[in-house]
């Protein structure tokens, strides 16, 4: 080992001599850098002067074409750069510049490092660890790649005077920060995250204005259609798509809001089951259910939640109505009303039906008609008319009566007359299907019947008997339920009518319309109270003459009062009760209104008859009862003269004379009906025939046709000369009726 250490190879000598020369040259360069130029630089300068230029290639000249000449004429400025080019500079050889000092230093350090590895017996002169720790300036700079900069600094191109487009690049001064390596990496990561977030926010902001409104509406419309189609095809699997439709309602565009509401309406109308969803009890929730039952229960509960949210959305829109809404907001309100009406017609059996009815009733409870008023009225009428059982009608009637009470019975007549559309007048008819089956089987021929063995006939009879018993049980249950619901409906309706009659408001005529139609269904125990209320109305002469009505219009309400009282008095079982049935006030009222009634030109017309409207006639409210005033008058006379007994002769003659006078003023059809009634009275009561003779009769005085009491008019001295005048009436029907009247009395 010692000999090997003392032995010196030629390579280390060469290396050591080279190291010494490098050290000397480096010291010499450091000492003379400020005063003398380097030898390498001087040698390069001397070489530049001695080197020759590169020979330019010879290119054959080419003649200019017509296209080249036109191009140069159009763009004269594009060849200006040729004048600034020196042909000699083009032939110069491109040479590299002087290398930086740091390059020689690093190269020498690398060479010394290699030599130190070769010779292990020589000590290192330079401290490489110290040099490696001292970082250079370029190493301290942050290593930023140009690809990290996501922002674009290009500006819009400009157009020069020559008509060319020139791109403009903005000057961006990126400050160089001197950070440590760890801090620079952290700052770069933070900056990149911030830039990514800013870029995402900018992209989100740019998305909205980039898409036009029409295109956005079209896209949303297509998306809503696709989602609705998927829901209708597979409602159980795609029920989650309803949330996406609800999200479209949050759009700032009214059109998309309306489309989302209509889409939800179509979906719910199709997927709502025909039964009411029953919530599970606590015991059922605790028990373990099968997979199919649990899936079905989850579907039903989710559907019910979405339906409740839809009704809540409609309620919010309907509550936001005001007279200051613009056309777009008003259109959204109308769409909400339409959704409400459609759900009433097709989802009244489903859950939350009370809330749905409350929404509809709230929109028609105001003193003025809002948009969609007629649609809600028609939908509620359809519910009342089509509900045979009465369960749904009971819910709606209860909500309506509560609203009437809150409004102090001051609502529109159309709303109040909804009670007249309730289907409680038709008796339930239970068909004996078993009897029909027996009849049809009896009519069949024996050869057409299939052959059955003795055992098969026995089984057939047993099955038939069980089926018949089940049908009878179902029919009894249905009949009991219907009777229960209809009794509750009648009770609520009559209480509403009584309250209206007691208040003597503007809806008294509508209440009388309802009482007259439903009086035959009223319980006998309430007849006395109803007669007392009607008697109070008859005694008050001003109750039928509000400010907006004339005396001619008040005759209808008076006739309704009298006809209702007469119908109650003639009902079955009333005679067995100890009721005060004195109808004297009603008789006087009937006698009093005959003359005002004869002045009504529309006495024989109803709303179903088409006619031109009189522009000078006072406005009339809508009447649900299509009965004409002449029909009501004939009904009163029918009850008073032909169903009652012990009528005084003075009343008979007074009413007959007043009817004859009224026939001179009545319209054509009413005059014919009046003469027919007189003919019937004269044939029933023969003592009235003396009114057609001119012989002198003993009486208490002269006949006074203007006294309102029929017993004090001295009608026994009156003469019926009106039929003789009506023989020459312009109407052939009236003339023929008068001739038949006189012929029946042999005059």
From Swiss-Prot:
GO biological process, one term: DNA replication initiation
Subcellular location: Nucleus, Nucleolus
Alphabetized InterPro entries for the sequence: CCAAT-binding_factor, Noc3_N, Nucleolar_cplx-assoc_3
GO cellular component terms listed in the entry, alphabetical order: Noc2p-Noc3p complex; nucleolus; nucleus
Stretch list, region Disordered: 1-142
Highest taxon of source: Eukaryota
Pfam family of the protein (one): NOC3p
GO molecular function, a single term: chromatin binding
Residue(s) carrying Phosphoserine: 120
Coiled-coil annotated residue ranges, if any: 214-234
Basic residues compositional bias, start-end: 1-11
Polar residues biased stretches: 74-86
Biased composition (Basic and acidic residues): 89-109
Intrachain disulfide bonds: none
UniProtKB keywords: Coiled coil, Nucleus, Phosphoprotein, Ribosome biogenesis
Function: May be required for synthesis of 60S ribosomal subunits and the transport of pre-ribosomes from the nucleoplasm to the cytoplasm.
Family: Belongs to the CBF/MAK21 family.
Protein name: Nucleolar complex-associated protein 3
Taxonomic source organism: Schizosaccharomyces pombe (strain 972 / ATCC 24843)
Lineage: Eukaryota, Fungi, Dikarya, Ascomycota, Taphrinomycotina
């Amino acid at each position: 080992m010692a000999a090997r250490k003392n032995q010196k190879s030629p390579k280390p000598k060469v290396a050591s001599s080279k190291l010494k020369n490098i050290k000397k040259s480096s010291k010499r360069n450091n000492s003379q850098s400020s005063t003398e130029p380097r030898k390498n630089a001087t040698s390069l300068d001397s070489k530049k002067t001695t080197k020759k230029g590169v020979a330019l290639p010879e290119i054959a000249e080419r003649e200019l074409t017509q296209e080249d000449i036109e191009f140069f004429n159009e763009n004269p400025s594009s060849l200006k750069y040729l004048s600034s080019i020196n042909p000699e500079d083009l032939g110069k050889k491109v040479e590299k510049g002087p290398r930086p000092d740091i390059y020689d230093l690093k190269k020498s350090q690398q060479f010394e490092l290699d030599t130190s590895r070769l010779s292990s017996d020589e000590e290192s002169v330079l401290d490489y660890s110290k040099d490696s720790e001292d970082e250079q300036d370029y190493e301290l700079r942050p290593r930023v790649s140009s690809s990290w900069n996501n922002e674009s600094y290009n500006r819009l191109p400009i157009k020069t005077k020559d008509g060319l487009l020139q791109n403009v690049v903005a000057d961006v001064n990126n400050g160089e920060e001197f950070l440590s390596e760890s801090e620079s990496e952290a700052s770069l990561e933070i900056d990149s995250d911030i830039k990514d977030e800013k870029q995402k926010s900018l992209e989100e902001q740019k998305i909205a204005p980039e898409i036009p409104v029409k295109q956005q509406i079209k896209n949303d419309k297509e998306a809503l259609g696709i989602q609705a189609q998927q829901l209708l095809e597979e409602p159980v699997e795609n029920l989650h798509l309803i949330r996406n439709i609800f999200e479209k309602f949050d759009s700032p565009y009214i059109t998309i809001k309306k489309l989302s509401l209509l889409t939800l309406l179509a979906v719910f109308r199709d997927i709502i089951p025909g039964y009411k969803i029953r919530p599970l009890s606590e015991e059922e929730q605790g028990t373990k259910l099968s997979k199919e039952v649990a899936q079905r229960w989850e579907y039903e509960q989710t559907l019910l939640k979405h339906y409740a949210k839809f009704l809540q959305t409609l309620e919010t829109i309907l509550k936001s109505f005001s007279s200051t809404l613009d056309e777009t907001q008003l259109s959204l309100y109308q769409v909400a009303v339409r959704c409400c009406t459609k759900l009433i017609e097709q989802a009244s059996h489903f859950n939350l039906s009370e809330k749905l009815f409350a929404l509809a009733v709230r929109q028609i409870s105001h003193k003025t008609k809002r948009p969609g008023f007629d649609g809600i009225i028609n939908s509620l009428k359809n519910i009342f008319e089509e509900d045979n059982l009465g369960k749904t009608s009971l819910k709606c009637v209860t909500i309506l009566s509560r609203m009437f009470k809150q409004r102090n019975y001051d609502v529109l007549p159309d709303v109040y007359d909804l009670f007249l559309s309730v289907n409680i007048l038709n008796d339930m008819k239970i068909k004996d299907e078993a009897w029909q089956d027996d009849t049809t089987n009896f009519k069949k021929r024996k050869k057409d019947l299939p052959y059955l063995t003795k055992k098969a006939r026995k089984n057939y009879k047993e099955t038939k008997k069980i089926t018949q018993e089940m049908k009878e049980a179902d029919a009894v249950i249905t009949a009991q339920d219907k009777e229960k619901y209809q009794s509750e409906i009648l009770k609520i309706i009559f209480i509403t009518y009584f309250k209206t009659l007691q208040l003597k408001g503007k809806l008294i005529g509508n209440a009388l319309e309802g009482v007259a139609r439903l009086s035959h269904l009223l319980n006998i125990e309430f007849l006395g109270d109803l007669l007392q209320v009607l008697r109070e109305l008859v005694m008050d002469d001003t109750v039928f003459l509000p400010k907006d009505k004339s005396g001619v219009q008040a005759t209808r309400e008076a006739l309704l009062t009298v006809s209702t009282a007469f119908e109650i008095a003639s009902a079955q079982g009333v005679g067995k009760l100890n009721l005060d049935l004195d109808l004297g006030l009603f008789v006087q009222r009937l006698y009093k209104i005959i003359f005002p009634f004869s002045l009504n030109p529309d006495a024989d017309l109803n709303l179903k008859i088409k006619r031109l409207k009189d522009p000078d006639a006072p406005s009339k409210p809508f009447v649900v009862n299509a009965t004409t005033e002449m029909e009501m008058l004939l009904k009163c006379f029918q009850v008073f003269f032909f169903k009652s007994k012990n009528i005084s002769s003075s009343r008979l003659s007074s009413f007959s004379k007043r009817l004859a006078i009224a026939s001179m003023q009545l319209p054509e059809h009413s005059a014919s009906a009046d003469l027919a009634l007189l003919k019937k009275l004269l044939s029933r009561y023969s003592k009235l025939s003396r009114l057609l003779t001119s012989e002198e009769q003993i009486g208490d005085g002269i006949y006074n046709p203007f006294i309102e009491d029929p017993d004090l008019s001295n009608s026994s001295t009156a003469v019926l000369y009106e039929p003789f005048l009506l023989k020459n009436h312009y109407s052939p029907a009236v003339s023929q009726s008068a001739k038949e009247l006189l012929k029946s009395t042999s005059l």
